[in-house]
C-alpha cells in the first residue's frame, strides 16, 4: 500500500456499490463517504462486495470522497 503525503487512512464498511466502480462507504465513526477503487486494485481484479471491510484514503481537502486502497480478507 503506497501512502500519499497528507492522506488520511481510515477503515470502513462497504454499504452499496454504485455505477462506475464507485462505492458508498460507512466509516468507523459513522460518516458516509463516496469512494472509488485504486488503480492497483483494478489492475489485479480485486472484487469489492457489500459488507466488505476496507481501508479508505481520504484527501484532507475533501473528506466526503476517497479511494479504496485495501480490502480485508
UniProtKB/Swiss-Prot annotation:
Report if keyword Iron-sulfur is assigned: no
User: Which family does the UniProt entry place this protein in?
Assistant: Belongs to the IF-1 family.
Q: Name one GO molecular function term.
A: ribosome binding
HAMAP family with a match to the protein in the record: IF_1
One of this protein's Pfam families, by short name? Answer: eIF-1a
What's this chain's function?
A: One of the essential components for the initiation of protein synthesis. Stabilizes the binding of IF-2 and IF-3 on the 30S subunit to which N-formylmethionyl-tRNA(fMet) subsequently binds. Helps modulate mRNA selection, yielding the 30S pre-initiation complex (PIC). Upon addition of the 50S ribosomal subunit IF-1, IF-2 and IF-3 are released leaving the mature 70S translation initiation complex.
Q: Name one GO cellular component term.
A: cytosol
- S1-like domain spans which residues? 1-73
Principal place of residence = cytoplasm
Q: List the disulfide bonds.
A: none
What is the protein's given name? Translation initiation factor IF-1
Cytoplasm as a keyword of this entry, yes or no, is yes
Its assembly, as annotated, is: Component of the 30S ribosomal translation pre-initiation complex which assembles on the 30S ribosome in the order IF-2 and IF-3, IF-1 and N-formylmethionyl-tRNA(fMet); mRNA recruitment can occur at any time during PIC assembly.
Amino acid at each position: 500500500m503506497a501512502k500519499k503525503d497528507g492522506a488520511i487512512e481510515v477503515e470502513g464498511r462497504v454499504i452499496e456499490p454504485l455505477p462506475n466502480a464507485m462505492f458508498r462507504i460507512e466509516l468507523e465513526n459513522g460518516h458516509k463517504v463516496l469512494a472509488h477503487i485504486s488503480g492497483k486494485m483494478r489492475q489485479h481484479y480485486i472484487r469489492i462486495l457489500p459488507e466488505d471491510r476496507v481501508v479508505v484514503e481520504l484527501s484532507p481537502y475533501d473528506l466526503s470522497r476517497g479511494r479504496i486502497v485495501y480490502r480485508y480478507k
